[in-house]
Amino acid sequence: MAKRGKRYQQLLSLIEKGRLYSPKEAVSLVKKLATAKFDETINLAVRLGVDPRHADQQVRGTVVLPYGTGKEKKVLVFAEGEKAQEAREAGADYVGGEDLVKQIESGWLDFDVAIATPDIMGTLKIPSRLGKILGPRGLMPNPKTGTVTNDIAKAVKEYKAGRVEFRTDRYGIVHVPIGKASFSEEALYKNLMTVLGTLLRLKPAAAKGQYFKSIYISPSMGPSVPIDTKNIADLVKQEEAA
């Protein structure tokens, strides 16, 4: 493992060894750890008590962060006629049908999210034509994440406002950006608790034992702050009831 630089070691010394922080303490500390010369993304990593090798224990979904991610997403929509007009009015960056499919087939991928109406998925044969291009990049429209939908306007607005997709990796870890270092502590905290609340609601029935195994937040260029998982479900429920 490569030796960390002096700056990283100095930041690491700000984290008490062996201590688990409350969500609010962790958010306060992670802002102090973001000392790079750019506005660092604050990332959340949650290890869940699931076995992702089993289909009934995979956790996948989307969440709309109340304060957004701090990054403007380029949204592409496969739609025609009235639905295409809805997409444009909602703020989609690229709207089209066969023209966009051909552009993507030729190597163009200058977008962050792809949304499609259910009918156009079939008429343009999007799964078979673009599956190998968009699938590995996590860009393939999918009903499970709300990117295959007839409510195009709502989907576009939500992704523009800060909707993010997530899924467990092969280790059972979910990675979600919860904002930028320039965000207020309140904004980062609200975004953090919103993600945890969403994960709690998506807990698979087949998952046994402790659900939140570990929770960490970190800036792009800094060390991770461990969050105490004890009573986290109660904290989430209190926050949602407030």
UniProtKB/Swiss-Prot annotation:
Q: Please give the Pfam families that the UniProt record associates with this protein.
A: Ribosomal_L1
- Molecular-function GO term, any one: structural constituent of ribosome
For whether the record's keyword set contains Transport, the answer is no
Matching SUPFAM superfamilies, A to Z? Ribosomal protein L1
What's an example Gene Ontology biological process for this entry?
translation
InterPro entries with a match to the protein in the record: Ribosom_uL1_bac-type (IPR005878), Ribosomal_uL1 (IPR002143), Ribosomal_uL1-like (IPR023674), Ribosomal_uL1/biogenesis (IPR028364), Ribosomal_uL1_3-a/b-sand (IPR016095)
Keyword tags: Repressor, Ribonucleoprotein, Ribosomal protein, RNA-binding, rRNA-binding, Translation regulation, tRNA-binding
Origin superkingdom: Bacteria
Single GO cellular component annotation?
large ribosomal subunit
Q: How does it assemble?
A: Part of the 50S ribosomal subunit.
Query: HAMAP family, per this entry?
Result: Ribosomal_uL1_B (MF_01318_B)
Q: What does this protein do?
A: Binds directly to 23S rRNA. The L1 stalk is quite mobile in the ribosome, and is involved in E site tRNA release. Protein L1 is also a translational repressor protein, it controls the translation of the L11 operon by binding to its mRNA.
| Similarity field | Belongs to the universal ribosomal protein uL1 family.
This protein is called what? Large ribosomal subunit protein uL1
Q: What is the protein's species of origin?
A: Dictyoglomus turgidum (strain DSM 6724 / Z-1310)
